[in-house]
Amino acid sequence: MPATAADRIRHWPGFYNARDLGGLPRNDGSVTKTGGYVRSADLRFATRTGLQEMVDSGISTVVDLRNDFETYPVPRSPQDELANAHRIPPTREAELPAGVFAVRVPLDNPEHEAFWQRMRAERRLGTPRFFGPVLREHPERVVAVLRAIAAAPGNVLYHCAVGRDRTGLVTFALLALADVRVEAIASDYALSAGELAPFFARLNFPNQEANINAVLAEQGHTLESAVAEQLDSLDVAAVLLDAGLTREEIERLRARLV
């Protein structure tokens, strides 16, 4: 039986936008396994108790999707300061309990300036409508992240900054590879809207959710339909295989869910 959203959310102290990918309905009528993957916002507020609860749940690897400049509280250069201008304040990588493997594999490549300018011009950034273009045009970073996750020991928590866009893209790929139903993938993405409100409030950072929804509405979409649009027009497994991910790696990624 599919899990409810409440069942999947992880209320570990200091964690935000954290939820398990288990309990989601697949196209064959089964549901995804619990415990293999947890998605999250960054761990800046995670307490020792929260981190221990994460470990006790079975997580043994944390994958950080952020760029270097997002991990330096004091900018190293004017370029770093500019890159962080519209992001939540940077924070160092979390200090994890002994025995937890940590790896950082940046998903974005800021050097693809023309691509990101186009995504802004098309008003795709901050919405799931950038998933397809990234996978089609710059899949190498997605492959690098998924390769690291496939090779990681044990169960995996992965996060970016707020746990919505880059984390959402990785989740989109993982759930598509596990043959999760389109509406379930879309619903999971949409959960971040409510889950991020207290995170933004604690940071005293503007919550852009209303603006994101307004942009999507102008384009004839909701959060859910925007995710479905990306899935309808993309064979995720084929794109990743063409970009160098192996079938063995895909099977290892799937094994935590099916």
Ranges and model annotations:
Residues 1-157, 162, 169-258:
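Cys-dependent protein tyrosine phosphatase-like superfamily
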